[in-house]
Amino acid sequence: METIIESRQRINSPGVLPPPLSPLIVDVTPKERASISNVANILLKAFGHYEHPDFISALHLNAFQLLPERIAGILSRFGTDFSRHQYGALVFRGLTEVDQEALGPTPPSWKETDYSKLVKYGFICSLLHGAIPSKPVQYYAQRKGGGLLHAVIPDEKMSHTQTGSGSRTDLFVHTEDAFLFNQADFLSFLFLRNEEQVPSTLYSIRSHGDTNAIMAELFKPIYKCPKDANYADDENAGEEVTTSILYGNRERPFIRFDAAEQIYNEKAGQTPEAMHNLVRFWDEAKQLIYNDFVPDSGDLIFVNNHLCAHGRNSFVAGYRNENGQLVKCERRLMLRMMSKTSLINIQSVTQLNDPYFIMEEHYGKLFHSQQ
């Protein structure tokens, strides 16, 4: 008779299950959705803002006590699962209702965002991170901080850039802030609007299966990554630090990767060996990109930033396709939150009096003048 241990070994043995090629999609029930909305309203009355110190300090307790049990359980397991079968992303379909009238028109860019209209959504996103458990943080490298919640809006002035404000070119898959050693551990993307019906793209290092010869070359610390298009060219100059693309366990690696900046940016300055390895890897990775999910209003994508890269297809902001005709609509609006599982490990790169504010500029270098 087969023992439990033998059964588990058989199930987990190589070749039994194929590598994951898509995220787990969780359909949130009407009861769960109503519960989450009610909880957010209660927290809004109690604390006023999702950045209130008393709320943030008790975030994990609030998350496990207040979120629907199924949702909290899914996130808690997700936070500790780095296995061969873990894709590294979750989709919560229909997480929350969005009052489009109360939201008002989408502003021209993130700079004009009225965050007073988004406080409830900030509570919802932070609770999800709290259930990992992980702590929302902000980065000086991203909008000089800008708070724990960022509105991501297509900006016509940046439409051709490889940033969240772009639209007219595909945003290549990337792990968030691949030019930092202390990049976010987890990301959430809450879609308030996506009337243009833009697919979100995801790519998981787990989709390759076991580490192959091409991937093994990416453990070498020979790769450069400039800061992204949010920075001027002179701010990107002279970045000579090199690091690996893959790190951690060699059989179940993590990834730090930005195709746009490390491969397509001519100023990256990769060595011939590094570029050769990157191009070979990218040829494989491109075949594994998932872009079958088109977010609707109220959907949320939750990502392990060490396992899964994200991006989006190109689109014409403010227009949707109806029977082959472009029809004007409200421009897309998404909310991003980032978090770290430990504040202890990042204290050397945070503001002295704010352990949630990360001051890393590029691979360990700090924005010293802003401390």
Curated annotation (Swiss-Prot):
Keyword terms, alphabetized: Dioxygenase, Iron, Metal-binding, Oxidoreductase
Query: Which domain of life, per UniProt?
Result: Bacteria
Q: Which amino acids does the record list as binding Fe cation?
A: H174, E176, H310
Organism encoding this protein: Niastella koreensis (strain DSM 17620 / KACC 11465 / NBRC 106392 / GR20-10)
Q: Which residues form a coiled coil?
A: none
Family per record: Belongs to the clavaminate synthase family.
Q: Does the keyword Disulfide bond apply?
A: no
Q: How is the cofactor bound?
A: Binds 1 Fe(2+) ion per subunit.
Q: What is this protein called?
A: L-lysine 4-hydroxylase
Check the record and name the SUPFAM superfamilies matching this protein.
Clavaminate synthase-like
Keyword Oxidoreductase listed: yes
Name its co-factor(s): Fe(2+)
What InterPro entries does its record include?
TauD-like_sf
Q: What's the catalysed reaction?
A: L-lysine + 2-oxoglutarate + O2 = (4R)-4-hydroxy-L-lysine + succinate + CO2
Which Enzyme Commission numbers does its entry carry?
1.14.11.-
- Which GO molecular function annotations are given, in alphabetical order? 2-oxoglutarate-dependent dioxygenase activity; metal ion binding
**Phylogenetic placement of the source organism:** Bacteria, Pseudomonadati, Bacteroidota, Chitinophagia, Chitinophagales
Name the job this protein performs.
Answer: Alpha-ketoglutarate-dependent dioxygenase that in vitro catalyzes the regio- and stereoselective hydroxylation of L-lysine, leading to (4R)-4-hydroxy-L-lysine.
